[in-house]
Amino acid sequence: MREWSHVRLFSTWGEVVDPAAERLLAPTGWTHPDSAAYPFGGDWAESYLLPLAGALGDRVRTGATVIGVSRTGRDRIVDADREQQPFVVRVTHADGREERLFARAVIDASGTWVTPSPADGSGLPALGEKAAADRITYRVPDLKGQAIRARYAGKRTAVIGSGASAFTALA
């Protein structure tokens, strides 16, 4: 997240703070930011995720790769009472050991920052995209840096996409 700390979220504080997490944070003296405000990634990390990780303590696990998340006793076809079932999370640890964990809540913070979509609408790279790789940026640039600003100053720039990141790049 530190890589995109300069990016304003497209969701408000009211949408990115989970009520259960807020209850967990209440005894720590944490106060909910303005629900209507749109935080930057860095604000969200510093003001919410880090305090939440502290409140969760040793329940936060690191050094493992999540292979998949589902609901206990349910598959993609059986959806009756799906929301009432605990999550089952399959992880692989750095030493190769696999583990199955059960949870009432899962925070998915994986995002798409490291796996951006290619430019062609089919999900494949556009013709010529690989050849132009040195002139393509797949992330919202941090324009506070002089070198980054110089890269774009006085040039025509195409912003490809219809998602929030494309809009944020223009904002």
Show which residues each predicted segment covers:
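Glycine-rich dinucleotide-binding loop and its adjacent helix/turn
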Residues: 41, 108-171
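Short aromatic-enriched loop/helix-cap "lid" or pocket-rim segments at secondary-structure transitions
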Residues: 2-3, 13-14, 72-75, 114, ...
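Alpha-helix boundary/capping detector
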Residues: 27-28, 75-78, 129-134
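Feature captures the FAD/FMN-dependent oxidoreductase FAD-binding
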Residues: 31-115
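Internal hydrophobic scaffold segments of catalytic domains
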Residues: 2-11, 101-103, 108, 171
